Amino acid sequence: MNGIINVYKEKGFTSFDVCAKLRGILKQKKIGHTGTLDPDAEGVLPVCVGNATKLCDLLTDKDKVYEAVLTLGIITDTEDMTGEVLERRLVTATYDRVLEVVEQFTRTYDQIPPMYSAIKVNGQKLYELARQGKVIERKPRTVTIHAIDILGVTPLEEQPEIVHEVRMRVSCSKGTYIRSLCRDIGEALQCGGCMKSLIRTQVSIFTLENTLRLAEIEECVKNQTLEQVLMPVDKLFLSMPKVVVKKESCKFLYNGNQLVEDNFTWEKVSDQINIDKIRVYDSEDVFTGIYEYDEKKNCYQPVKMFL
C-alpha cells in the first residue's frame, strides 16, 4: 500500500496520534505525517503511506494556508487561548488600524518561535523547558507571509468601533507559527493578542474540501474503497514531463543508475524542451522516481526513487 491520504486532523489529537491510529486502521507500519499541527489546531494533514513516506520532507517544505482567529488584548504564555493569561490590555484598534497593521506583515520577516513549540535547543524541546517554568532566548527564524486576508472581525460589545477579534486567512512559508504571527500583530497594535483557533486549509495541492476524518478512513477500509482516497505518489509531480523507460533499460532504472535519452521515450515530444526534472516510469508504466538533468554529464541523475 503506497500513497498519500489527505487526513482531517481533529482537535485533541497530535499529529503523532493520527499516524498511530492510521497504523492500526491500515495495518501498515510505514506511515509518516508531513508537518506538525498543534493538538488544538485542526485541518489538513497529508499522511504518507508506504514508499510515499519518502515525500514527508518534501511536503513539509511546501507553503501552507491557514484560517485563524486572533483575540486582541490578551497575552498568554502559550500565545493561544489554552495558556495561562499573563496580561490583559486595553484595546483601542479600529478596523482601519487593524487592516493597516496586518498589511505590514505581508513580507519576509524574522519571527521568534513560541516557547511552547517542538523546536529543540541544546537537545531539549522548548515546550519541555516551558513546562518547567523556564523561558529561554529563542533564535528568530526567517519566514514569509505571502498574504493575509481579513475574513471578518468581531467588535467589542460596549464599543462597536473597536475590534475584539480578527478572523483571517494566512498564506505562508514553512516554519511559520501562526500563534507567533498573532502575537506579533497584537504587539504592533500595542494591545497584545493571542490565537483563539486555527484551521489549516491547504498544504501544497491538498485542500480542506478533500480531507477525510479517521472514522471515514476506517469506513473506507471496511468497504474496501481505500484505493479511491489513497492519492498516487506521482500526482504530486504532474507538472514534470513524463518519460517511459524502454524495457531493455529498466535494469538501469531499478538500480538507481543515471539515464540518457536513448534509455526512454517522452510521453509528449514538446516536453523535451523542459529538461530540468522528469517523472520516470518503467516499461510497465509504473511510476519509479524523479530524475534531474545533469548538464555536465549530459544525462539524468536520480533525485528520489519510489521502488
UniProtKB/Swiss-Prot annotation:
<dbReference type="GO" id="GO:1990481">
    <property type="term" value="P:mRNA pseudouridine synthesis"/>
</dbReference>
<comment type="function">
    <text>Responsible for synthesis of pseudouridine from uracil-55 in the psi GC loop of transfer RNAs.</text>
</comment>
<dbReference type="InterPro" id="IPR014780">
    <property type="entry name" value="tRNA_psdUridine_synth_TruB"/>
</dbReference>
<feature type="active site" description="Nucleophile">
    <location>
        <position position="38"/>
    </location>
</feature>
<dbReference type="Pfam" id="PF01509">
    <property type="entry name" value="TruB_N"/>
</dbReference>
<dbReference type="GO" id="GO:0031119">
    <property type="term" value="P:tRNA pseudouridine synthesis"/>
</dbReference>
<dbReference type="InterPro" id="IPR020103">
    <property type="entry name" value="PsdUridine_synth_cat_dom_sf"/>
</dbReference>
<dbReference type="GO" id="GO:0003723">
    <property type="term" value="F:RNA binding"/>
</dbReference>
<keyword id="KW-0413">Isomerase</keyword>
<dbReference type="Pfam" id="PF16198">
    <property type="entry name" value="TruB_C_2"/>
</dbReference>
<protein>
    <recommendedName>
        <fullName>tRNA pseudouridine synthase B</fullName>
        <ecNumber>5.4.99.25</ecNumber>
    </recommendedName>
</protein>
<dbReference type="GO" id="GO:0160148">
    <property type="term" value="F:tRNA pseudouridine(55) synthase activity"/>
</dbReference>
<dbReference type="InterPro" id="IPR002501">
    <property type="entry name" value="PsdUridine_synth_N"/>
</dbReference>
<comment type="similarity">
    <text>Belongs to the pseudouridine synthase TruB family. Type 1 subfamily.</text>
</comment>
<keyword id="KW-0819">tRNA processing</keyword>
<dbReference type="InterPro" id="IPR032819">
    <property type="entry name" value="TruB_C"/>
</dbReference>
